[in-house]
Swiss-Prot record:
Effect of deleting the gene: Dose-dependent altered root gravitropism associated with an altered PIN2 traffic that impairs the formation of auxin gradients, thus leading to an irregular waves root shape.
Note: 'Golven' means irregular waves in Dutch.
Residues with the Hydroxyproline modification: 154
Keyword Transcription: no
Annotated region (Disordered), positions in chain: 144-163
Presence of the UniProt keyword Secreted in the record: yes
Protein name as it appears in the record: Protein GOLVEN 3
GO biological processes: cell differentiation; positive gravitropism; positive regulation of cell population proliferation; regulation of root development
Amino acid sequence: MMRFTIIVIAFLLIIQSLEEEHILVYAHEGGEAGHKSLDYQGDQDSSTLHPKELFDAPRKVRFGRTTRAEKEQVTAMNNDSWSFKISGEHKQTNILADHDTTKNTFCKKMMIIVNDLTSLPTLEPSTSTNDMEKLARLLRDDYPIYSKPRRKPPVNNRAPDKF
């Protein structure tokens, strides 16, 4: 479970760093200043074809992408289980996460402070040799489909030529 949370944390950190560098492109009307989005920004190539400044009307964005981006924004705002604050000056990452500290369903919020991402434990595959043998047996062609082998039918139900 800890490895899974580390993978999720790393993935979310990568996404956040891409957002800060304005690499990710969002499909929503009226983004932040200097932020790339699919609404019309009045670039030089198409300014003569669709002059936004003259009509002052936003470009119509495709319906599916807009709603998907808005849903992702709403779920990101409503998601209380993860919150990140990255401070570039201190090179410190504060991660707030729900962490199950007891056997029952009681969860408390705890803060994990990671000074350097290299200090996280290395991710190793969690498969043992026994699991690998089971997987190899499942992937073999001669592995039976059913868990129990079929038994021979009783003598009175066999075909006449099988006696």
